[in-house]
UniProtKB/Swiss-Prot annotation:
Chain's role: Binds to actin filaments and promotes cross-linking into thick bundles. Has an actin-stabilizing activity. The actin regulatory activities are not regulated by pH and [Ca(2+)].
Keyword Cytoplasm: yes
Record-given protein name: LIM domain-containing protein WLIM2a
Recorded GO MF terms: actin filament binding; metal ion binding
Pfam families per UniProt: LIM
Subcellular location: Cytoplasm, Cytoskeleton
Gene this protein is translated from: WLIN2A
Subunit text: Interacts with F-actin.
Keyword list, A-Z: Actin-binding, Cytoplasm, Cytoskeleton, LIM domain, Metal-binding, Repeat, Zinc
Organ and tissue specificity: Expressed in roots, leaves, stems, flowers and siliques. Barely detected in pollen.
Length: 200
């Protein structure tokens, strides 16, 4: 019995990938040694990589790329090119549907009222939150969209929600507490907005 080989080629080096050294990410074949961040060249594993349009990055560089450019373009910011006398040709292309998803957002976090970008967004009950803001308002416990309770727009972990209900036997004190927290958050946001306006 003879081994006839494989037709799979490594995306990085374009050489044949044999089963013993095969790593498949997003349906693309790599040698284990060739599976590296396209920016820093550090070796990646299936548990610590992100990719966009077939380009793989370590998670820190993937996030940095998004934060620098506001979109998932393939390149990090490069040094400014010298200006030339030639006018820039007008592009007549329309952006792809995917580009529209990352071109910016108007979504504001229901907790801190700051802009929520798609990479950090959690949406529940038509409200958007930063992942870091999506936590129990009573104990600060981490919660998930499948494990939370909300009353009057205030988030609780199920444990604290049940505990607070059992203390009084009703939700009335929670509703009062929720309205106080909402008023405090609105006052804090208004004060921050006033402080951000420069004096003329």
């Amino acid at each position: 019995m003879s081994f006839t080989g494989t037709q799979q080629k490594c995306r990085a080096c374009e050489k044949t990938v044999y089963p013993v050294e095969l790593l498949s990410a997003d349906g693309i074949s790599y040698h284990k040694a060739c599976f590296k961040c396209s920016h820093c060249k550090s070796r990646l594993q299936l548990s610590n990589y992100s990719s966009m349009e077939g380009v793989v990055y370590c998670r820190p560089h993937f996030e940095q790329l998004f934060k620098e450019s506001g979109s998932f373009s393939k390149n990090f910011q490069s040094p400014a090119k010298p200006l030339t006398d030639k006018p820039t040709p007008e592009l007549n292309r329309t952006p792809s549907r995917l580009a529209g998803m990352f071109s910016g957002t108007q979504d504001k976090c229901a907790t801190c009222t700051k802009t929520v970008y798609p990479i950090e967004k959690v949406t529940v009950e038509s409200q958007c939150y930063h992942k870091s803001c999506f936590k129990c308002s009573h104990g600060g416990c981490p919660i998930s969209p499948s494990n939370y309770a909300a009353l009057e727009g205030i988030l609780y972990c199920k444990h604290h929600f049940a505990q607070l209900f059992k203390e009084k036997g009703s939700y009335n004190h929670l509703i009062k507490s929720a309205s106080i927290k909402r008023a405090t958050a609105a006052a804090t946001a208004a004060a921050a907005a006033v402080a951000a306006v420069p004096e003329s």
